[in-house]
Amino acid sequence: MNVLHLRAAYFMENNLAAISMIHGMGVFGNALLPDLKLPMIATRDVGDYAAQRLLDLDFSGKQARELLGERDLSMTEATAVIARGIGKPDLRYEQFPHDQVQQALTQMGVPPKVAALYIEMYKAINAGVVAAQEPRSRENTTPTSFEKFVQDVFAPAYHGKATTA
């Protein structure tokens, strides 16, 4: 059996969960370190890559491919792009304490055990335990920039004009 495992980076779409926070608190934040650079990928790029590989069937045995998005960004950098894209130049990123993030998740309806796993994930990302295993290359870099994602997906969702991607 031929299997290709795709290991996608941090989804750009994860940032959509902060829209209500931006509206309500005027800040963007989570438990990630502000200056830790992360590869961020649009889910559309993952789907496009998977579809192309299934059409080509150019893999054999068991293989893994990391998909790292267009470039690495820190949460501070991503917030600056979001700020420009939604017309809120003063928007800033704030790293929240783990206990506050866990409490917020459970208040949003996330089961406590799942919220605890999110905190474990944030801690592992911040510590470098969860990180890309391959260096960035032409093969694992995808086309959608964070600016394009904000323009096409985040800003319309923020302004209540979301369309299907």
Regions found by a protein language model. Give the residues of each.
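Conserved strand-loop elements at the edges of beta-sheets that form or border functional pockets
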Residues: 95
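A hydrophobic C-terminal alpha-helical subdomain
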Residues: 98-165
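Oxidoreductase cofactor-interface core, primarily capturing Rossmann-like NAD(P)-dependent enzymes
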Residues: 1-92, 100-108, 112-114, 164-165
